[in-house]
Amino acid sequence: MTNIRKTHPLMKILNDAFIDLPTPSNISSWWNFGSLLGLCLIMQILTGLFLAMHYTPDTSTAFSSVAHICRDVNYGWFIRYLHANGASMFFICLYAHIGRGLYYGSYMFQETWNIGVLLLLTVMATAFVGYVLPWGQMSFWGATVITNLLSAIPYIGTTLVEWIWGGFSVDKATLTRFFAFHFILPFIITALAAVHLLFLHETGSNNPTGIPSNMDMIPFHPYYTIKDILGALFLILTLLALTLFTPDLLGDPDNYTPANPLSTPAHIKPEWYFLFAYAILRSIPNKLGGVLALLLSILILVFIPMLQTSKQRSMMFRPFSQLLFWTLIADLLTLTWIGGQPVEHPYIIVGQLASILYFFLILVLMPTVSLIENKLLKW
């Protein structure tokens, strides 16, 4: 008799996705991050659900309800910090996953890649609206500054901003709708992730060499299930260490002050995972220009497959491209650092140079160097 997992309509889908899936035999630990992102998503939905049971999305009680969760709810502090630091782990995995895709040429699976970019934007939106919910100073002013960027859109900008706010400033209506968005978006992310996986399984996984591996595949289970479990243990260990020893390491002290529209914090800045984009936004001394640069800094990922000039898919055998890739990573780290600094000399000029380098590397240097490497192949 055939095993039920191969015949049952539902089990068959799971079987083909996680058990009998033919997988390249040589994929490295950089391929772990997909499953880790799935784990992060499940953890965030569960911790978020329990937080939502005690949270009140109202300006007069939101801050107090978060304090109540931390003080009076059984293990409420633990759930709250797991959720806050879980977001950081989510973005670490997300950036590692994208970096892997860029390095090994996974972006040549265009449908998978484009849905991935859509997922990135959705996760960023979810994190942004989530950061507003505790209704601390940085929540309020972050929401004010970022939503205000839409006013740079010609003609309809101001109307659009007031429509999103639900009034003439960030207030009750804004908080309520942001809570609604924050609740629904993770389920949209889950659906998108399923489609992401569907498209990936149409082609099969890429591998470090970038060479088709159809002749050398192994079943996902037990080889990669055990490998993913190891990655998951590392992730959980890191998250628990962060949550139990330094829960506020990545947060902003300003968010422990209740939101006050009459007093602006000295330095308004987003969470660490948005700092690189924030630095690019600030590096252009024009509102519309900054907003466009901010958008392009993320949407540039959509154009990566079109900028592929190399005859080789992966960077594994391309030392010059590798050098530029790691320069790009260093540049992004520099932008992240600059995004957290005040707007003064020398940070302004460093941020502007790093922003120019970011776009120059992706749009000019990397495609050019790939062409040079193609020539070197003939030597």
Swiss-Prot record:
Gene3D superfamilies documented for this protein: Cytochrome Bc1 Complex, Chain C
Binding site for a ubiquinone: H201
InterPro entries referenced in this protein's UniProt entry, alphabetically: Cyt_b/b6_C (IPR005798), Cyt_b/b6_C_sf (IPR036150), Cyt_b/b6_N (IPR005797), Cytb/b6-like_sf (IPR027387), Cytochrome_b (IPR030689), Cytochrome_b_C_euk/bac (IPR048260), Cytochrome_b_N_euk/bac (IPR048259), Di-haem_cyt_TM (IPR016174)
Membrane-crossing segments per the record: 33-53, 77-98, 113-133, 178-198, 226-246, 288-308, 320-340, 347-367
Entry-linked CDD domains: cytochrome_b_C (cd00290), Cytochrome_b_N (cd00284)
Main location, first listed in the record: mitochondrion
Cytoplasm is among the record's keywords: no
Annotated keywords: Electron transport, Heme, Iron, Membrane, Metal-binding, Mitochondrion, Mitochondrion inner membrane, Respiratory chain, Transmembrane, Transmembrane helix, Transport, Ubiquinone
Residues annotated as binding heme b b566: H97, H196
Any one annotated GO CC term: respiratory chain complex III
Residues binding heme b b562, per UniProt: H83, H182
Membrane topology: Multi-pass membrane protein
PROSITE patterns cross-referenced by the UniProt entry: CYTB_CTER (PS51003), CYTB_NTER (PS51002)
UniProt keyword Transferase, yes or no: no
Note, other: Heme 1 (or BL or b562) is low-potential and absorbs at about 562 nm, and heme 2 (or BH or b566) is high-potential and absorbs at about 566 nm.
Function: Component of the ubiquinol-cytochrome c reductase complex (complex III or cytochrome b-c1 complex) that is part of the mitochondrial respiratory chain. The b-c1 complex mediates electron transfer from ubiquinol to cytochrome c. Contributes to the generation of a proton gradient across the mitochondrial membrane that is then used for ATP synthesis.
Subunit structure: The cytochrome bc1 complex contains 11 subunits: 3 respiratory subunits (MT-CYB, CYC1 and UQCRFS1), 2 core proteins (UQCRC1 and UQCRC2) and 6 low-molecular weight proteins (UQCRH/QCR6, UQCRB/QCR7, UQCRQ/QCR8, UQCR10/QCR9, UQCR11/QCR10 and a cleavage product of UQCRFS1). This cytochrome bc1 complex then forms a dimer.
Family: Belongs to the cytochrome b family.
Protein name from the UniProt record: Cytochrome b
Species annotation: Sagmatias obliquidens (Pacific white-sided dolphin)
Upper lineage: Eukaryota, Metazoa, Chordata, Craniata, Vertebrata
Gene: MT-CYB
